[in-house]
Curated annotation (Swiss-Prot):
Electrogenic proton/amino acid symporter with selectivity for small apolar L-amino acids, their D-enantiomers and selected amino acid derivatives such as 4-aminobutanoate/GABA. May be involved in the efflux from the lysosomal compartment of neutral amino acids resulting from proteolysis. May play a role in specifying sites for exocytosis in neurons. It comes from Homo sapiens. Pfam families: Aa_trans. Optimum pH is 5.0-5.5. Belongs to the amino acid/polyamine transporter 2 family. Residues 1-15 have a biased composition (Basic and acidic residues). GO terms for biological process: alanine transport; amino acid import across plasma membrane; amino acid transport; glycine transport; L-alanine transport; monoatomic ion transport; proline transmembrane transport; proline transport. Changing residue 329 to A/S: Loss amino acid:proton symporter activity. No effect on localization to the plasma membrane. Disulfide bonds join 180-329. This is Proton-coupled amino acid transporter 1. Glycans are attached at residues 174, 183, 470. Keywords: Amino-acid transport, Cell membrane, Disulfide bond, Glycoprotein, Lysosome, Membrane, Symport, Transmembrane, Transmembrane helix, Transport.
C-alpha cells in the first residue's frame, strides 16, 4: 500500500457495528454531484431495499445482543424492557437526525456523500458561534476518536467473549451430556485462567488482521453471519422452553445497577455510524427512512425479546453473555463454539475502521521501502493493545458497559442532537426542537458520566471479582 494512496484515500465511516467494509460507499468525499435534488444519491450504486435491510439487521446483531439479559437484570423485569424501548426510539431518532443533516450538506455543498465526521465538521462550520466555526475541524477528530475507542472497545469485548466461551467449553468437555433439555450439574475440569486463553487467541487474531483485502474480509463476514444466525436461532429455541415462575424477579432493580444497564443497552444500539454508508449504496435512497425504521423496529423487538426471555429463563444466574448459561450438552456447546467462530472472524471487520484512521498517519511518515513493515507493525500493536486491555478488564459485562458508556453514548446520543442545533439554528428552529435536542444530549451525557463511573467502580471492588464458572452449575 503506497504512501500516496494512504494520503489520498478518503476515509469512509463504515460503522461501529458488525458490518463489513465492502458494504461501505465506494465513492470518495470529493466526488461532486450534479446540481439539484438529493436524488443524485445512489445512482451509481446497486443495493436493493431488501439488501440494505439485511445489512442494517446484520450490523446491529453482535456481542451486545447476548449481554442484554444481564442488562435487563440490572434494570428490572419491567423497567428493563421499557428502558430498552425508550433508548431504541431515541437512538433511531438520532440516526434520523444524522441522515437529515447529511442530506442538508450534500445539497448545500454539492457533494455526493458525506460521512459522520464530515457532517459534524460542516455542522460546526454552520454554527452561529465563531469559536465553533474556527475549530470546526475538531468535529471530525472528535468523531474519529470515539469511533476508534468504540471499535477497539468492541475488539476488547471479543477477546473476553472468546476466552470465556472457549474456557467453559473446554472445562465442561468431560461432562458434556446428550440431555439438551435441562441444565445439569457437571464436574468442571479446571484449566488455565481466562486471560491465558486471551493470549492464546492473540497470534491468530494478529494474522487475521494482516488480511487487508476487502474482498477477502467479506468472505469472513459471510461465514460469521451464518454461524451467528444459526447460534441465535438455537439460543431462542432453548430460552422459550419451560420458563420458570417470574414472580421472584424484581420489577425494578436497585438504582445503583441501572447505569450498567444503560451502558450495555447503548452499546447494543450504537449502529449510527453505518446509516450513511448504507444509504449511499441504495438504488433508491428515498426509501431509506422506511428501511431504517423497519429495520430498527425488528432490532428493537429482537433486543427486548432476548433480553427479557433470557432473564426470565436464567434469573439471577444470568451471565455477561447468555451463551455462558446454555446447557453442557453437545448441541449447545456447539452453539457456543459457532458463535465464537463468528465473533473471531468479525474481529477483523471491527478492526478495519480504527486501522484505516490510525495506520495512514504512521505509514505516510515512513520510508517507502518500509511502508508494509510499518503497516503490519501498527496492526500488531493495536491487536496487542486490545488484548492487554481485555486482560486488565476480564469481565465481559463490565467491558461492554464501559465501552457503551464512554464512546457509544457520545456517537449515538450526545453528538447528533447538538449537530442538529449547529446545522439549522441559523435557519430558524422552534424552541421545542431545541429543548428536545438539549434534553437528549443531557441524558446522553448523564449516562456517559454515571455509566462510566459505575462500571469503573465495579471494576475496582475486590468483593465483586467474578468467578468464572458455568452458570448451569447453579441448577442442582
Amino acid at each position: 500500500m503506497s504512501t500516496q494512496r494512504l494520503r489520498n484515500e478518503d476515509y469512509h465511516d463504515y460503522s461501529s457495528t458488525d458490518v463489513s467494509p465492502e458494504e461501505s460507499p465506494s465513492e470518495g468525499l470529493n466526488n461532486l454531484s450534479s446540481p439539484g435534488s438529493y436524488q443524485r444519491f445512489g445512482q451509481s450504486n446497486s443495493t436493493t431495499w431488501f439488501q440494505t435491510l439485511i445489512h442494517l439487521l446484520k450490523g446491529n446483531i453482535g456481542t451486545g445482543l447476548l449481554g442484554l439479559p444481564l442488562a435487563v437484570k440490572n434494570a428490572g423485569i419491567v423497567m428493563g424492557p421499557i428502558s430498552l424501548l425508550i433508548i431504541g426510539i431515541v437512538a433511531v431518532h438520532c440516526m434520523g437526525i444524522l441522515v437529515k443533516c447529511a442530506h442538508h450538506f450534500c445539497r448545500r455543498l454539492n457533494k455526493s456523500f458525506v460521512d459522520y465526521g464530515d457532517t459534524v465538521m460542516y455542522g460546526l462550520e454552520s454554527s452561529p458561534c465563531s469559536w465553533l466555526r474556527n475549530h470546526a475541524h475538531w468535529g471530525r477528530r472528535v468523531v474519529d476518536f470515539f469511533l476508534i475507542v468504540t471499535q477497539l472497545g468492541f475488539c476488547c469485548v471479543y477477546f473476553v467473549f472468546l476466552a470465556d466461551n472457549f474456557k467453559q467449553v473446554i472445562e465442561a468437555a468431560n461432562g458434556t451430556t446428550n440431555n439438551c433439555h435441562n441444565n445439569e450439574t457437571v464436574i468442571l475440569t479446571p484449566t488455565m485462567d481466562s486471560r491465558l486463553y486471551m493470549l492464546s487467541f492473540l497470534p491468530f487474531l494478529v494474522l487475521l488482521v494482516f488480511i487487508r483485502n476487502l474482498r477477502a474480509l467479506s468472505i469472513f463476514s459471510l461465514l460469521a453471519n451464518i454461524t451467528m444466525l444459526v447460534s441465535l436461532v438455537m439460543i431462542y429455541q432453548f430460552i422459550v422452553q419451560r420458563i420458570p415462575d417470574p414472580s421472584h424477579l424484581p420489577l425494578v432493580a436497585p438504582w445503583k445497577t441501572y447505569p450498567l444497564f444503560f451502558g450495555t443497552a447503548i452499546f447494543s444500539f450504537e449502529g449510527i455510524g453505518m446509516v450513511l454508508p448504507l444509504e449511499n449504496k441504495m438504488k433508491d435512497p428515498r426509501k431509506f427512512p422506511l428501511i431504517l425504521y423497519l429495520g430498527m423496529v425488528i432490532v428493537t423487538i429482537l433486543y427486548i425479546s432476548l433480553g427479557c426471555l433470557g432473564y426470565l429463563q436464567f434469573g439471577a444466574n444470568i451471565q455477561g453473555s447468555i451463551t455462558l448459561n446454555l446447557p453442557n450438552c453437545w448441541l449447545y456447546q456447539s452453539v457456543k463454539l459457532l458463535y465464537s467462530i463468528g465473533i473471531f472472524f468479525t474481529y477483523a471487520l471491527q478492526f478495519y475502521v480504527p486501522a484505516e484512521i490510525i495506520i495512514p498517519f504512521f505509514v505516510s511518515r515512513a520510508p517507502e521501502h518500509c511502508e508494509l513493515v510499518v503497516d503490519l507493525f501498527v496492526r500488531t500493536v493495536l491487536v496487542c493493545l486490545t488484548c492487554i486491555l481485555a486482560i486488565l478488564i476480564p469481565r465481559l459485562d463490565l467491558v461492554i458497559s464501559l465501552v457503551g458508556s464512554v464512546s457509544s453514548s457520545a456517537l449515538a446520543l450526545i453528538i447528533p442532537p447538538l449537530l442538529e442545533v449547529t446545522t439549522f439554528y441559523s435557519e430558524g428552529m422552534s424552541p421545542l426542537t431545541i429543548f428536545k435536542d438539549a434534553l437528549i444530549s443531557i441524558l446522553g451525557f448523564v449516562g456517559f458520566v454515571v455509566g462510566t463511573y459505575e462500571a469503573l467502580y465495579e471494576l475496582i471492588q475486590p468483593s465483586n471479582a467474578p468467578i468464572f464458572i458455568n452458570s448451569t452449575c447453579a441448577f442442582i
